[in-house]
């Protein structure tokens, strides 16, 4: 089954083989790349998946999305052309042994975070601090018994750089790709000051979360579970032991797929 993670800035695709219970990461497409030239990059990837997996018409897919409406329209139309029916998953108050910490408005928790919580609970099976460093840095506390204790949302590295570029006259044009990552240091020019400041903000948030975890988990052991493209670098800057899972969200989608087929 095709698994889809439609994020803020790119969509990621994976394949779940129900016979072997293996998840294979297929790739990712930045949204800007396919919106600029309609949906050709997306269609190319989907056609490759359909042909290589020998999918039949009316094949099912399952996904979650925090993407913009325009992106979702492109995704849905491209998938429909190939006869792929997508079951988009929503956040629930309780599912697969996990209880949503957003008790007043559970649906306000992003479905990407919810899928990661489901995947973490199934994979880790103990207290976990989940650090997902993508477009935004999200941090969630999850008890071994499945209780979600809440979390934080922090602007990611590129969002911080963009905010400075938009809000000031002379600080435009810095991207994550420009940054040389050698750990924290005092900036000796404006460029270094900005990039090191972003690094300090992100690692500082994670460090505070780790410190709070002792209280939230009643001084019981916990794992630091890391996902997202920037996560491993940030953790190494902090010199903290962690477990990395590139497919955490897809593991959550796989659990939902099990329910579709049951």
UniProtKB/Swiss-Prot annotation:
Top EC class for this record: transferase
Family: Belongs to the type III pantothenate kinase family.
Pathway: Cofactor biosynthesis; coenzyme A biosynthesis; CoA from (R)-pantothenate: step 1/5
Alphabetized NCBIfam families for the sequence: baf
Alphabetic keyword roster: ATP-binding, Coenzyme A biosynthesis, Cytoplasm, Kinase, Metal-binding, Nucleotide-binding, Potassium, Transferase
Catalytic activity, reaction form: (R)-pantothenate + ATP = (R)-4'-phosphopantothenate + ADP + H(+)
Record flagged with keyword Cytoplasm: yes
GO BP annotations, alphabetical order: coenzyme A biosynthetic process
Cofactor(s) annotated in UniProt: NH4(+); K(+)
GO cellular component, one term: cytoplasm
InterPro entries found in the cross-reference section: ATPase_NBD (IPR043129), Type_III_PanK (IPR004619)
Residues involved in ATP binding: 5-12, 135
Name of protein: Type III pantothenate kinase
Role noted for this protein: Catalyzes the phosphorylation of pantothenate (Pan), the first step in CoA biosynthesis.
Chief location bin: cytoplasm
Cofactor comment text: A monovalent cation. Ammonium or potassium.
Subcellular location: Cytoplasm
Species this chain originates from: Idiomarina loihiensis (strain ATCC BAA-735 / DSM 15497 / L2-TR)
Residues noted as binding K(+) in the record, renumbered to the chain: 132
Positions contributing to substrate binding: 102, 110-113, 190
Gene Ontology MF: a single term: metal ion binding
EC number: 2.7.1.33
Lineage: Bacteria, Pseudomonadati, Pseudomonadota, Gammaproteobacteria, Alteromonadales
Active site: 112
Gene: coaX
Assembly: Homodimer.
């Amino acid at each position: 089954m095709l698994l889809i993670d439609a994020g803020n800035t790119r969509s990621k695709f994976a394949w779940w083989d129900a016979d072997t219970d293996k998840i294979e990461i297929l790739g990712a497409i930045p949204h800007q790349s396919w919106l600029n030239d309609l949906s050709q990059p997306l269609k190319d990837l989907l056609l490759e998946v359909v042909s290589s997996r020998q999918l039949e018409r009316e094949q099912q897919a399952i996904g979650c999305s925090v993407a913009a409406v325009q992106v979702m329209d492109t995704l849905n139309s491209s998938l429909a052309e190939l006869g792929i029916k997508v079951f988009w998953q929503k956040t629930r108050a309780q599912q697969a042994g996990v209880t949503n910490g957003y008790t007043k408005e559970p649906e306000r928790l992003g479905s990407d975070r919810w899928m990661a919580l489901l995947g973490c609970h199934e994979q880790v099976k103990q207290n976990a601090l989940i650090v997902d460093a993508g477009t935004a840095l999200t941090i969630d506390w999850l008890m071994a018994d499945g209780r979600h204790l809440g979390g934080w949302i922090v602007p990611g590295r590129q969002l911080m750089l963009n905010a400075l570029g938009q809000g000031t006259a002379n600080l435009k044009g810095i991207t994550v790709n420009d940054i040389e990552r050698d750990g924290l240091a005092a900036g000796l020019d404006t460029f270094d000051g900005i990039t090191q400041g972003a690094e300090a903000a992100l690692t500082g948030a994670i460090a505070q979360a780790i410190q709070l975890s002792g209280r939230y988990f009643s001084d019981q052991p916990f794992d630091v579970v890391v996902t997202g493209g920037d996560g491993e670098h940030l953790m190494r800057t902090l010199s903290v032991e962690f477990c990395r899972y590139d497919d955490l969200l897809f593991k959550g989608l796989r659990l939902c797929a099990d329910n579709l087929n049951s």
